[in-house]
Amino acid sequence: MPENSSIPNCCEASGLAARPSWSGSAGARPPVTARAPWVAPMLSTVVVVTTAVDFVGNLLVILSVLRNRKLRNAGNLFVVSLALADLVIALYPYPLILVAIIRDGWVLGEAHCKASAFVMGLSVIGSVFNITAIAINRYCCICHSTTYHRVCSHWYTPIYISLVWLLTLVALVPNFFVGSLEYDPRIYSCTFIQTASTQYTAAVVAIHFLLPMAVVSFCYLRIWVLVLQARRKAKATRKLRLRPSDLRSFLTMFAVFVVFAICWAPLNCIGLAVAINPEAMALQVPEGLFVTSYFLAYFNSCLNAIVYGLLNQNFRREYKRILLAIWNTRRCIQHASKHCLTEERQGPTPPAARATVPVKEGAL
């Protein structure tokens, strides 16, 4: 089948999915397998549910922090930054993936393909770096509380968040030189192609996943040690005194980290295995396992808001307030619309009906 010359290594002229150009590993092309008819509807359902929960959930997180004074602190500014990283993926790449599933291939052109892959990478790496920054922030807050308020105030936190996103952009630049952002028909997505450069894939897994996870693990391990020390002593010293709000925030963000690691570990393990031995592993990885690991990673973007609601009472209460306010506004609009429609159907009240009926003498 001839490829569309205007969209090299992206999609075919007929609109059906074409295999990406596995540059650097010509012999490591995964086998083409026929798919069961239920696969596309199932993946469509996953994308639709993930997009809806991602959009609504992360919007609730952002509004909750902006509305609630108890949540409006320096630490939760990182939470807003993480929510934005998850939200952006629901606004652009996910709808394009849904179109590719429905059309059974990429039909939106090379520009959208590259842009979608870039935004996808921006969201993923931004999430990793924000989770790392949150862990460092919690570590400084709990383990070094005396210096925390000086180095993590409302004035410095926006600078740290800007640095996180600057590092995210810098981390994405090499993709344009390696040529690793292409369409992969197995997952109906324009994304990072693991076999484009085995050395670069190994570096990506190490720098964008293993190293941040090691830093986060160290920070949370130190916090756990401090928490256990504080609980073992009947009267904790000033150094070990923990506020309930700090402990609750730590547990919430630790759960976010665990969920992220579980969702992204399978895909990164596959990437590392392919980078170590591309000729053998690229052929041995089952397509079902690869697709499942990718969509599990996608699904992570909608889980953080759920974790906040389950583990943090302030977020849960603010969710209810926002949803209740939206519901009441909707009911008021519906009531006003029904009232207007009733008046239009009945027509204007005649003057005689509006006139005051005179009271007869002796009626009282």
Curated annotation (Swiss-Prot):
The chain crosses the membrane at residues 43-63, 77-97, 116-136, 156-176, 201-221, 254-274, 288-308. Keywords: Cell membrane, Disulfide bond, G-protein coupled receptor, Glycoprotein, Membrane, Receptor, Transducer, Transmembrane, Transmembrane helix. One of its GO terms (cellular component) is plasma membrane. Residues 352-364 have a biased composition (Low complexity). Its main location: membrane. It holds the Pfam family 7tm_1. Signal peptide: none annotated. GO terms for biological process: circadian rhythm. Residues 343-364 are annotated as: Disordered. Residues 64-76, 137-155, 222-253, 309-364 are cytoplasmic. Gene3D superfamilies: Rhodopsin 7-helix transmembrane proteins. GO terms for molecular function: melatonin receptor activity. PANTHER family: B2 BRADYKININ RECEPTOR/ANGIOTENSIN II RECEPTOR, MELATONIN RECEPTOR TYPE 1B. High affinity receptor for melatonin. The activity of this receptor is mediated by pertussis toxin sensitive G proteins that inhibits adenylate cyclase activity. This is Melatonin receptor type 1B. It comes from Mus musculus (Mouse).
